[in-house]
Amino acid sequence: MAMTAEVKDELSRLVVNSVSARRAEVASLLRFAGGLHIVSGRVVVEAEVDLGIIARRLRKDIYDLYGYNAVVHMLSASGIRKGTRYVVRVAKDGEALARQTGLLDLRGRPVRGLPAQVVGGSVADAEAAWRGAFLAHGSLTEPGRSSALEVSCPGPEAALALVGAARRLGVSAKAREVRGSDRVVVRDGEAIGALLTRMGAQDTRLTWEERRMRREVRATANRLANFDDANLRRSARAAVAAAARVERALEILGDTVPDHLASAGKLRVEHRQASLEELGRLADPPMTKDAVAGRIRRLLSMADRKAKQDGIPDTESAVTPDLLEDA
């Protein structure tokens, strides 16, 4: 089951005892999943959701809390509709329900954000508002670089109200307009986990966190492997470049090169991939890596000075792009 469906399934089974929180969830779900329609002069309340269990929960809550009967219609997948959808409709008592849930104000005008009693309610009401909004139009992506918990909103006022509810829960959420659609997005991994728990999807949070940890471990391992590979490549190229320069230095100096510098240089040429420490162990008598590095440095410096005096290519000329590519 996809993460979004897992969250919605768990939230739909959550038992909420607080009447105030249940009312806040219903109001939010109706606000984010549907709207008010005028049919034959009457107000009809509708909410369209993507899971049958959500529709059944909403229908039950509307009856338990307000005493109104809601009808559920199933819309089969067709055309642009990818999956089966469920429409919860209250027609006969639509206006009464709209007023009681706060979807209509005292003057009978549609509320553009969230109802005042939800916005000014308790922390449990803020959790319920998020639960209703997620059940209506929420999504949760798999953990990764672009992981996000997101809710599509009916308008900017509803988005800002949801951001405010998140703030009350200690979660940082941002309202954004994406391709003409208002959305509220939470991207931080810790914040997503906290919000899942706040809404009531603790089991899904544990699953999501486990996947996030596994992904982070894999990503760290890959980074370390890439880092090690890059270091090895750099070391190999540096050794090949040094060997080429030493070879050129021995050509430039010929018989004039001091024996102790010549022996260090020959070790570098004969063992191109070896580290300075390994060269020191191969020397007779053995030397420290600093002693090897010092002798090679003096050899190159002496050869470059002579090349400059004689007007010939120095040791750097031996290090060509083709040479490094082959390293």
UniProtKB/Swiss-Prot annotation:
Gene3D superfamilies: Homing endonucleases (3.10.28.10). This is Probable cell division protein WhiA. InterPro entries: Homing_endonucl, Sporu_reg_WhiA_N_dom, Sporulation_regulator_WhiA, Sporulation_regulator_WhiA_C, WhiA_LAGLIDADG_dom. It comes from Mycobacterium sp. (strain KMS). One of its GO terms (molecular function) is DNA binding. Belongs to the WhiA family. Residues 304-327 are annotated as: Disordered. It comes from the Bacteria. Involved in cell division and chromosome segregation. Keywords: Cell cycle, Cell division, DNA-binding. GO terms for biological process: cell division; regulation of sporulation. Residues 275-308 bind DNA.
